[in-house]
């Protein structure tokens, strides 16, 4: 889960740089040796090696002796130094002092100081505090106090901002006279801190008088992004180290990583690491490209990464047990570094407050939307915009705004879905010959999102058909099946339902007992019961999994069928949900005859077909990779309008939700543009986090206007906030429960042992748990 910046520089070049820094750290700055060394001397160990390889000046222009690389490369160096808690003044010298000099635009000072910093001959830092500078002869004298200055006790040059009659100005202090340094004992022993007191200390002016404010704001923003990268790799490395311990440690006769309680905790830590890594990556990407949302993205990363690093370090201690609580173990060092980092450039709470305020005030930086597709331009989306302008009428918009619940489509909607399907926009990722436009996943997702934004997309009742049945038939169907089922599905002529779950086979879907017995070469006789089938009461067809060979292990004797719901013997009974609606159904299949031509995929190979359907379901529940305003932004707007934003608890919950939602967007964005990424991993993470965000939204929305959501007129519709509250658990269950998603992440992404299943390899008719 390293910060891959493939979109900024050559992936191979970044990988080479990462390997180079990792080797230098392993040779000169190993964690095992650094922890026992003298703190001051330890911070200079390996400094010459970093200088010889040009790493100290990696982002310094070549004219000053640097490598002339960019922010992406500097982030890689920060990442690899942080992975092993390397105790160097790299942050202070290369990320603060050098950047402050460059931001000043003072070519004379840069030409004198930067080559020495790059060569490792000079260490420096940037101090922030309250100080005043007065002119004296050909110089300036500075008086003031600076607290918790990174490597301030040992830096040979201290850059600082001091007030003057012309405004805040940058100065360099290199002498000892008038400079009092207090080396502090620190929570994080790998990074030195000092308090500085200057009393009429001589300082050299750097840059123009009054120019320090904007220059240092840029430096601080860049340093905050780089520190987020450091926090992200700490969060990720804590997962890596803990995973190995859970695999190595054995108790009760097995690896402790097999225990679900530990698996779920590590899965949650892995999710946090993925989200904060995605947010750090996105922040670096946007900042390097000087994007409009760069400052907002950096603030999201600082909030997400600062929190996740501390949480994951604490979780590493917990999951290591007693050994993790010892001085000799390295776990506490990661906790110390992560916590100390939170206070360098603003706490997570401070960053969350900044984000929430920006959204509440509707600032442009908070409303910027960035898409994988639209960043590079999309002729297909341009075509969609033109098509919508020509085809969307007030009648279509009005019919979508007030659809008849649970009924078949109105004539207006039938006409609209037919036009949408004929143009290929209902199913844009499908091949053109089957009613699509042949777009890729990201571009197609952006097209669907645009239809949703306009309020003219296909309804929720079509979810199974468009997002599950269609892609599954495309992948597994014969040419005849594709020709038969796909075009009318694209035109909105048929609805589909999913017939997987049974009363005795929910999360353990492979235990299904609905049987399909051959009548002859052309027909099957199906008997059984299905449950939790959304919209089965209005469906024309169903995706059916049935057992065709009970002598095979439970995963091996299943076959997949496309069931005509109008067949004799199919009985659908609606189930009323806690909202009062009846989307769920139980379906009874009694001597239903299914033609063999409706069998999808190989005989007894239906489990693989079903898994592909479930993967489509998880992906489709989370939306396309877009970074921008989402549900949290909408809720903040509602909170401001209702006055609930003044409630500290509501504000805090919404700000946490805002950070998590933007971090999830960033992680999804990263997965879409990065090479060699496993889509299954990010889809499971997106499903888990999206479900959690949906639940939190339901809990918060009812609190925004409680006077309306707990009681309403007898003849009125249920308020949206009440419905949202009652539906909050919907996606924590639908499409695979959150607990199952944690199992998937732990076992398939992290590689922890699978849950014990005594029936896994037994013939189904000989299983133990019947």
Q: What are these regions, as identified by a protein language model?
A:
Residues 99, 103-125, 141-142, 147-150, ...:
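A generic, well-ordered mixed alpha/beta core segment in the N-terminal half of proteins
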Residues 1-84, 120, 220-454, 476, ...:
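Alpha-helical interface subdomain recognition
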Residues 148-151, 175-208, 566-595:
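Flexible, small-/acidic-enriched active-site or ligand-binding loops
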Residues 29, 36, 88-107, 461-480, ...:
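N-terminal glycine-rich flavin-associated loop
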Residues 119-129, 160, 492-500, 545:
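A short, Trp-centered hydrophobic/proline-enriched beta-strand micro-motif
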Residues 133-137, 514-517:
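A structural signal for short hydrophobic beta-strand segments in well-ordered beta-sheet cores
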Residues 192-222, 590-617:
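A short, charged helix-loop
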Residues 127, 143-180, 523-575, 585:
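A short core secondary-structure module
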């Amino acid at each position: 889960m390293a910060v891959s910046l493939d979109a900024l520089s050559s992936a191979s070049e970044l990988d080479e740089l990462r390997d180079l820094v990792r080797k230098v750290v392993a040779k000169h700055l190993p964690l095992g040796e650094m922890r026992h060394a003298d703190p001051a001397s330890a911070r200079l160990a390996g400094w010459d090696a970093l200088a010889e390889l040009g790493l100290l000046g990696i982002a310094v222009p070549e004219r000053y002796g640097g490598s002339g690389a960019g922010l992406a490369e500097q982030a890689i160096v920060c990442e690899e130094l942080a992975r092993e808690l390397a105790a160097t003044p790299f942050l202070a010298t290369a990320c603060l002092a050098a950047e402050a000099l460059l931001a000043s635009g003072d070519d004379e000072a840069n030409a004198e100081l930067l080559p020495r910093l790059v060569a490792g001959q000079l260490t420096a830092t940037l101090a922030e505090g309250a100080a005043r500078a007065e002119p004296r002869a050909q110089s300036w004298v500075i008086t003031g106090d600076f607290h918790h200055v990174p490597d301030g006790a040992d830096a040979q040059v201290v850059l600082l901002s001091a007030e003057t009659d012309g405004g805040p100005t940058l100065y360099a202090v290199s002498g000892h006279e008038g400079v009092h340094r207090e080396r502090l004992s620190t929570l994080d022993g790998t990074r030195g801190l000092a308090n500085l007191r200057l009393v009429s200390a001589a300082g050299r002016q750097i840059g123009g008088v009054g120019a320090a404010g904007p220059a240092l704001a840029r430096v601080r923003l860049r340093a905050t992004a780089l520190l987020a990268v450091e926090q992200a790799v700490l969060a990720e490395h804590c997962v890596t180290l803990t995973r190995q311990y859970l695999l190595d440690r054995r108790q009760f006769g097995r690896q402790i990583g097999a225990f679900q309680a530990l698996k779920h905790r590590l899965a949650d830590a892995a999710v946090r690491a993925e989200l904060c890594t995605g947010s750090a990556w996105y922040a670096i990407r946007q900042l390097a490209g000087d994007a409009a949302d760069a400052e907002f993205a950096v603030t999201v990363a600082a909030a997400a990464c600062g929190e996740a690093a501390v949480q994951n370090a604490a979780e590493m201690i917990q999951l290591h047990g007693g050994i993790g609580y010892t001085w000799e173990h390295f776990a506490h060092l990661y906790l110390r570094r992560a916590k100390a980092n939170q206070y360098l450039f603003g706490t997570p709470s401070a960053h969350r407050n900044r984000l929430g305020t920006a959204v509440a005030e509707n600032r442009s930086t908070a409303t910027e939307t960035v898409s994988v597709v639209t960043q590079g331009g999309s002729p297909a989306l341009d075509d969609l915009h033109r098509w919508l302008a020509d085809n969307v009428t007030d009648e279509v918009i009005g019919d979508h705004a007030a659809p008849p619940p649970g009924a078949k489509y109105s004539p207006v909607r039938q006409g609209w879905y037919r036009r949408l399907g004929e143009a290929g926009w209902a199913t844009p990722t499908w091949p053109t010959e089957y009613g699509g436009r042949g777009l890729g996943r990201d571009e197609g997702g952006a097209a669907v999102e645009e239809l949703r934004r306009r309020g003219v997309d296909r309804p929720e009742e079509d979810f199974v058909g468009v997002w599950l049945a269609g892609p599954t038939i495309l992948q597994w169907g014969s040419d005849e099946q594709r020709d038969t089922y796909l075009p009318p599905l694209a035109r909105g002529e048929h609805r589909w339902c999913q017939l997987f779950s049974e009363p005795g086979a929910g999360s353990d879907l492979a235990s299904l007992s609905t049987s399909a017995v051959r009548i002859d070469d052309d027909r099957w006789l199906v008997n059984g019961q299905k449950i939790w089938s959304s919209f089965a009461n209005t469906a024309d067809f169903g995706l059916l999994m049935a057992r065709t060979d009970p002598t095979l292990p439970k995963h091996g004797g299943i076959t997949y069928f496309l069931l005509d719901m109008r067949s004799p013997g199919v009985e659908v009974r609606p189930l009323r949900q806690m909202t009062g609606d009846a989307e769920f159904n139980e379906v009874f299949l009694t001597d239903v005859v299914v033609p063999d031509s409706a069998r999808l995929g190989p005989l007894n190979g239906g489990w693989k077909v079903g898994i592909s359907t479930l993967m489509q379901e998880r992906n489709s529940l989370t939306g396309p990779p877009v970074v921008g305003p989402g549900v949290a932004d909408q809720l903040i707007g509602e909170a401001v309008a209702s006055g609930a934003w003044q409630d500290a608890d509501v504000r805090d919950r919404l700000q946490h939700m805002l950070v998590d939602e933007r971090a999830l967007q960033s992680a999804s964005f990263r997965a879409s543009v990065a090479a060699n990424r496993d889509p299954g991993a990010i889809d499971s993470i997106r499903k888990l986090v999206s479900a959690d965000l949906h639940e939190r939204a339901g809990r918060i929305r009812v609190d925004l206007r409680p006077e309306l959501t707990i009681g309403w007129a007898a003849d009125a519709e249920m308020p949206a906030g009440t419905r949202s509250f009652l539906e909050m658990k919907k996606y924590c269950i639908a499409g695979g429960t959150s607990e199952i998603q944690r199992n998937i992440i732990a076992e398939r992404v992290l590689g922890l042992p699978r849950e014990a299943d005594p029936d896994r390899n037994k013939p189904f008719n000989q299983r133990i748990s019947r």
